[in-house]
Amino acid sequence: VGDKAINFNRRDLIATMGAAAAGHALIADSVSHANNPAANVDDRHSTIKITGMRATWVNPNVFLRIETNHGIIGWGDLKGVDPRVSKPLAESLFELINGENPTRIEHLWQKIFRAHRDIRGGPFLIHTLAAIDMALWDIAGKLWGVPVYRLLGGPTRDRIRVYHTKQAVKIPAAPEEHSGTPAAIDAIVERIKDARKKVGPTGAVMFDAHSAIPPATLIQLASALKPYDLLFIEEPAVPGNIEVFKRLKQHISIPLAAGERDRTIYEMLPYLLHRCLDILQPDCCHTGGITSMKKIATLAEAFFVPLAPHCTASNLGIAASLHVTASIPFFLIHEFYPENGGFNPKGIMRMEWKVDADGYVGLPNGPGLGIDVDEKKLEEEGKKPQTYRWPGRTLKDGSIADY
């Protein structure tokens, strides 16, 4: 072409191109247009970094406070394991997230989960990871000024069904040792019969076996409980042997629920593949946090299995679990004990939960988790001596039992 100037306008250029190339040009033109919001997205929070973390032990929980260079902090609830181990573990894991962008939540979850091949998936790591993950979601929600459930896809319901309401009745536990005799089974049946009478024909009756009843005995018991229309039998067996759960499902017609002692999608998947649970009960503080619980819900959805989340956390953990629950389609009922002092230890949190006349609680507030922590009170309580004793159950003959 030599010295000649080539003066093609965009229309002339597109006219000389093939259809596919023309399409690409038009798309590029649209994307680059100054008035297209999608073409001008600026991540205003790309400069935010994690700068510090404080772990405070107030029985029975360890509370994590994750700090950022923007002055926004996030809170996490670490529970269910020995605080004498989990607190220093959290402080050790901080080196993996220090200086990172807290909104890279999935990336940081994977970084911690995969960091050490020999403790990957173990309860101490996963419970600690759950608290860190919870705090990161709290930060993200506060950054964008929205409740966490908005970041999880938005609400799928207007309110959340819970148990432990004003109408709820908790029947005292049965004897710790189950002989399997007809008399022992009859004693438990009488308790369930009494519960059904108190809540009426439309109330929900649930039986928690707490992994403490031998399979053969539970099969007999479940048969005797059929007339009382149980919503589910919880924790029918100790996790770890899927064959036991398969046997129970084969012989028990009442829906079976479990999952509070299982962690991440990897431990939940066998229940679904073998079709031996009707309801999954992940605990947000046990299973890897908000990130993990959301994945479990999606996994269960593919099998049309609803969640009935286990939750014996502080108000922080309750809020985290409710945020996930607000965003998932397959849901049954949520464990809920906010009036118990153990869920607001020493009164360090400010959060009001209002249960309506039908037994539902409203969607959790925001921004973030929506929980206010009295840091002065937390610091005061954290300076006091804290104690912990390993739980356990011993039978009358001195042997050790599951519980």
Residue ranges and their predicted role:
Residues 159, 163-251:
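Metal-dependent enolase-superfamily TIM-barrel catalytic cores that perform enediolate-based chemistry
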Residues 1-8:
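N-terminal secretory signal peptides
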Residues 8-26:
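N-terminal export leaders
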Residues 69-146, 402:
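Metal- or metallocofactor-binding catalytic centers and their adjacent structured scaffolds
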Residues 91-95, 100, 107, 223, ...:
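Shared catalytic-loop signature of beta/alpha-barrel
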Residues 27-60, 66, 73:
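C-terminal segment of N-terminal export signals and the immediately downstream linker at the start
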Residues 369-403:
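Extended hydrophobic packing segments that form well-structured cores
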